[in-house]
Amino acid sequence: VADETTVEQAKQLIGLLWRREVPPRPGGRGPKQTVSVDAVVRAAIALADRDGYAKVSIRAVAAELGLRPMSLYTYVPSKDALAVLMADAVADEDAPIAPELPLRDRMAAIARQARAELLAHPWLLEVPPWRLVLGPGRMRRFERQLAAIDDIGRSEVELDRVIAVLTEFATGNARMAVAARRETQVMTDAQWWDVHGPLLSGAMSPEAFPLASRVGKVVGELYEAPGDPDGAFDYGLNRLLDGILPASIGP
């Protein structure tokens, strides 16, 4: 059984998430708020986009808004709660998926939107996704995703799993793409290889790794980088859709 503190925290967070849909609970008189919760969330998102999730704190967001740190607690109770609000706001940025598109394109759009969101807001990869409390933004996105594939005529469980597989694939690829982008801001891949390539060539014998040497030579010349997240995403998504569609649109 949850303790009273956990229940109260849940009520507070859900009230913040659904603040437009659910009337605020009556409470005591407190300090007058000079900005909106929306403004706090927007400031936190801008800060995370610019400086990274680690730099987001109640104090830092308050500074962005020209407020005293303690006053921000009248809007959000903690950084954890703020992160949930941030993720929910970002989820509402997805465009609708056109229903007239072929089913394969609609499924691909689910994965592409999930990846694009993470590339635009890489700090989302640092927000714990398990038990992330649902708000209207994430629920509207889920509704849009379900609407995009509802005509495959399959069970509710399969609809949910199709979306989960597509978004989890996109998340894994986005994580690699974000890592590559961060690394190349410090040193280009060509500069990195100039240092490590000759040393690795001296340590690794092609005779000991004939297949890896053959494939590595070809892809190294093609990618001019340790990998190709964009190409891997397109290839992997197509293979994933090849596997999903026969089971989804069969008789």
Where are these regions (language model features)?
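N-terminal intrinsically disordered/low-complexity leader segments
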Residues: 1-34, 209-220
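Short, amphipathic alpha-helical "lid/cap" segments that border enzyme active or binding sites
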Residues: 41, 104, 230-241
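Hydrophobic alpha-helical bundle segments that form small-molecule/ligand-binding pockets
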Residues: 141-198, 244-247
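Amphipathic C-terminal alpha-helical segment
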Residues: 168-185, 202-226, 242-250
